[in-house]
Regions:
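Hydrophobic/aromatic-enriched cytosolic interaction surfaces used to assemble or bind macromolecules
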Residues: 1-176
Length: 176
């Protein structure tokens, strides 16, 4: 955590490269999730990365929960048959447990849906999550909430997911 950030800052200081800010993935994802929030409603946002997954729950633009899940987009895409089914069941169970615990701890926040961002094609996963979770599940589509005319490649959901952290960092308020 703080030690890793400190090491990174010292490297930049040593190279005389000024840093205006350092973002962490959880806050970058929060910034993107805020684009999909509904007023007075909580939003679960699951990003499937190449190494693992990050689940965040936001409300009013604030991050209330962040959790890493050891299931990656690549692992799911490469798995077949029974192995894929086991991974999906594990992911569903982790999501259900987290949503249930969140509901108990923050009963004043109603999580109304889960947005899924995946670096791999995941229509089949979207359907599986939708069948097994008690909240509606939708694919992240930044084109529905933002306009990127200078970046036509961001019309592709997988490219959006690949650039999720950079996009989230660019959306940070309060400075560079």
């Amino acid at each position: 955590g703080a030690e890793a950030v400190g090491r990174c800052m010292r490297l930049f200081d040593g190279a005389r490269v000024p840093l205006a800010a350092i973002d962490i993935p959880e806050l970058a994802q929060r910034n993107v999730a805020a684009l999909f929030e509904e007023a007075n409603r909580g939003l679960a946002f699951l990003s499937l990365g190449e190494a693992d997954s990050l689940l965040t729950i936001t409300y009013g633009g604030e991050l209330y929960l962040a959790r890493r899940i050891e299931v990656s987009a690549r692992t799911l895409a490469e798995a077949e048959g029974e192995r894929r089914q086991v991974l999906v069941e594990r992911l569903v169970l982790e999501l259900q447990r987290t949503l249930d615990n969140f509901d108990r701890q923050y009963n004043f926040i109603s999580v109304v849906r889960l947005v899924l961002a995946s670096e791999q094609p995941a229509d089949w996963l979207l359907a599986a999550l939708g069948e097994n979770l008690y909240v509606p599940v939708q694919a992240m589509d930044l084109a529905a909430v933002a306009d990127f005319p200078a970046l036509p490649e961001l019309k592709n959901p997988q490219r959006q997911a690949q650039g999720l952290l950079a996009i989230g960092a660019a959306l940070r308020e309060g400075g560079p």
